[in-house]
């Protein structure tokens, strides 16, 4: 474990052991304590590094009239530890993919999503170069490497459901092998026929000649594809039209910044300050360009710098240039939660709207503090990523399963 002053990183379980339970109201303290769990190996890592380098959180807090903040960014390579810290009150903030976020929102005391810190991963389905697997039909009876119960597992289930009309992978003869480390995705593994991977690891594996891509999360085929649509990369698989979130993806990937509900109620200005800092980091890095983003976050990411550059150009905050939650973003959680092979309890539309609405005031305050960017009309712009009314208009949202 290594610490870097008060704003440095601590890692995993050691970080949780070092933290007190959150019980003291900042009203009785000169500076507001903020414990923020992050996954540096994902795209939020670059935003966090920029916030630290430029002291964006401290500056935003001062602008909002806070006496001061004491941020502690804590790196969690294992998501379970972060979830445990949030549930126990040892972390006030966390970064979650949609799969753990849905599970967290169905609890009795849910977290509140307040910003988008990433998304857009293409989750390639890959095989060794000499594999007889060329399409989804060929995957029947085979073994797939993934992380069971994760976003990767969710992508595989939704691919197969669109193609075959069932979420039951066992009924299709597909066996799952649970990986121990992300590095396993960069090459063929003994006893495994295919990897449901993620980028940048998959890009690096393909460039090294270790794996080839059949299909991506956006419905586009890879170089190894052979099927009714033709051969090679860049085709759209026919069954992709059956997925509810086309044309974006089988799984419209998002990474959410979430906050404990009690902390949000007690510290709205501190939450607003973090959102302001995050948006300023997004704006600065987007303007700086891909090379600067990779330079900022590369040390914590997998794959080669060249693969990271290709990956960053797909990241949602890089493409949008802003981090606000929209009605369309929220609707993806409601829709995805109906995937029974992954989730035991669906996220009810009205319950979801009420949870998101808890962050409406702080989101609007952060939007105004950062110059009201983008213009309101941008939210209604028809793009490949689902948009819609911003979260400060959540009272008028119409979420549907």
Q: Can you say where each PLM-predicted feature lies in the sequence?
A:
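Short, polar/charged alpha-helical segment
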Residues: 42-75, 105-107, 158-162
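Pocket-lining segment of extracytoplasmic ligand-binding domains
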Residues: 188-298
């Amino acid at each position: 474990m290594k610490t870097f002053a008060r704003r440095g990183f601590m890692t995993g379980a050691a970080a949780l052991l070092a933290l007190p339970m959150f019980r003291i109201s900042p009203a009785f303290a000169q500076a507001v304590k903020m414990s923020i769990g992050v996954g540096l190996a994902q795209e939020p890592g670059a935003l966090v590094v920029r916030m630290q380098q430029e002291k964006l959180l401290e500056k935003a807090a001062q602008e909002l009239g806070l006496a001061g903040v004491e941020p502690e960014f804590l790196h969690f390579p294992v998501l379970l530890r972060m979830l445990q810290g949030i549930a126990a009150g040892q972390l006030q903030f966390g970064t979650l993919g949609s799969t753990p976020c849905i599970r967290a929102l169905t609890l009795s005391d849910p977290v509140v999503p307040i910003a988008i810190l990433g998304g857009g991963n293409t989750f390639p389905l890959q095989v060794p170069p000499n594999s007889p697997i060329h399409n989804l039909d060929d995957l029947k009876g085979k073994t797939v490497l993934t992380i069971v119960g994760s976003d990767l597992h969710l992508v595989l289930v939704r691919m197969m459901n669109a193609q075959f009309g069932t979420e039951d992978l066992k009924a299709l003869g597909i066996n799952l092998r649970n990986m121990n480390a992300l590095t396993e995705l960069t090459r063929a593994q003994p006893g495994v026929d295919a990897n449901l991977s993620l980028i940048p690891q998959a890009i690096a594996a393909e460039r090294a000649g270790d794996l080839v891509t059949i299909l991506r999360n956006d419905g586009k085929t890879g170089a190894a594809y052979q099927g009714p649509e033709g051969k090679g990369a860049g085709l759209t698989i026919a069954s992709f039209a059956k997925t509810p979130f086309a044309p974006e993806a089988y799984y419209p990937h998002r990474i959410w910044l979430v906050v404990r509900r009690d902390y949000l109620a007690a510290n709205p200005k501190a939450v607003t300050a973090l959102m302001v800092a995050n948006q300023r980091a997004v704006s600065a890095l987007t303007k700086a360009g891909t090379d600067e983003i990779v330079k900022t976050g590369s040390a914590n990411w997998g794959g080669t710098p060249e693969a990271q550059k290709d990956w960053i150009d797909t990241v949602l905050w890089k493409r949008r240039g802003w981090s606000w939650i929209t009605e369309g973003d929220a609707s993806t959680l409601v829709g995805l939660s109906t995937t029974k092979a992954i989730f035991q309890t669906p996220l009810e539309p009205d319950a979801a709207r009420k949870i998101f609405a808890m962050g409406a005031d702080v989101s609007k305050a952060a939007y105004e503090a950062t110059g009201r960017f983008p213009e309101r009309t941008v939210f209604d712009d028809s793009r490949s990523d689902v948009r819609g009314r911003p979260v400060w208009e959540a009272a008028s949202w119409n979420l549907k399963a």
